[in-house]
């Protein structure tokens, strides 16, 4: 679907919400990209920022799920020594990877050219740097060799920069700070295979938030406690995995 040239910021916003309701997330991405580029150096509102995140999260989410399914079928076919099918599956996987790369490149360009430079508040800086880390992490999930190494390094840089600002400017119970700790710890566990570091990061974020629970505002209570639950779920899973590995060793 070609976008009309002269859409206003309000029209882009309305159409993005419409596309979200219709679950047409690729178009939602286009409307939000157009909104960002059209607004130049002026900052996004919290609503606009969240819509941009939702749009890309849905598009990348279905592609990541597709990649995981295709990869597991590829392993099964290799196990069966079915060479003809393996060739077809590999080719199909590379098409999905090409789409993943394009989506990541799209949001990373928007973040670097528009959103990160224009962010003034600590909260929005952390939000965008976390997002940058997330999309480099999604690249690291399927890239191999040097490309994987570079994607992992870029993920680390973005998450570290976000963490520095989050610790200095956001409360331990702030949902964006908690979400960053959640994703950063997943990066340590899944991409760097550093399970102890992943556990200590998740545990620290959880405990710091628990200590300040009584100071939490109504508006973020639900978001924060949901992320805290996810941190605790990961900790439970990771520590039992580590215990199993130690038992096997």
Curated annotation (Swiss-Prot):
PROSITE patterns xrefs: 1433_1, 1433_2
Entries under InterPro entries matching the protein: 14-3-3, 14-3-3_CS, 14-3-3_dom_sf, 14-3-3_domain
A GO CC term attached to the entry: cytoplasm
Domain of life: Eukaryota
Alphabetical GO biological process terms: protein localization; signal transduction
SMART domains reported in the protein's UniProt record: 14_3_3
Quaternary structure, from the entry: Homodimer.
PANTHER family: 14-3-3 PROTEIN
Family to which the UniProt record says this protein belongs: Belongs to the 14-3-3 family.
Protein name in the entry: 14-3-3 protein 1
Source organism of the structure: Solanum lycopersicum
Taxonomy of the source species: Eukaryota, Viridiplantae, Streptophyta, Embryophyta, Tracheophyta
């Amino acid at each position: 679907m070609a976008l009309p040239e002269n859409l206003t910021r309000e029209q882009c916003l309305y159409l993005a919400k419409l596309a979200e309701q219709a679950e047409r997330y690729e178009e939602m991405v286009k409307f939000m990209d157009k909104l960002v580029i059209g607004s130049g150096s002026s900052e996004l509102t919290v609503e606009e920022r969240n819509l941009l995140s939702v749009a890309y999260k849905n598009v990348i989410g279905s592609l990541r799920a597709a990649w995981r399914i295709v990869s597991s079928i590829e392993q099964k076919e290799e196990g069966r020594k079915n060479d003809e099918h393996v060739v077809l599956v590999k080719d199909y996987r590379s098409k999905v990877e090409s789409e993943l790369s394009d989506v990541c490149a799209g949001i990373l360009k928007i973040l670097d050219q528009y959103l990160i430079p224009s962010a003034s508040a600590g909260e929005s800086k952390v939000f965008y740097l976390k997002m940058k880390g997330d999309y480099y992490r999604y690249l690291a999930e399927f890239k191999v060799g040097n490309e994987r190494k570079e994607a992992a390094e870029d993920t680390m840089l973005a998450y570290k920069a976000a963490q520095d600002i989050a610790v200095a400017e956001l409360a331990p119970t702030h949902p964006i700070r908690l979400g960053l700790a959640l994703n950063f710890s997943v990066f340590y566990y899944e991409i760097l295979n550093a399970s102890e570091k992943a556990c200590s990061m998740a545990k620290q974020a959880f405990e710091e938030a628990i200590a300040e629970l009584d100071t939490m505002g109504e508006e973020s209570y639900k978001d924060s406690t949901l992320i805290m639950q996810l941190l605790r779920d990961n900790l439970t899973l990771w520590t039992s995995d580590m215990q199993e590995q130690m038992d096997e060793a």
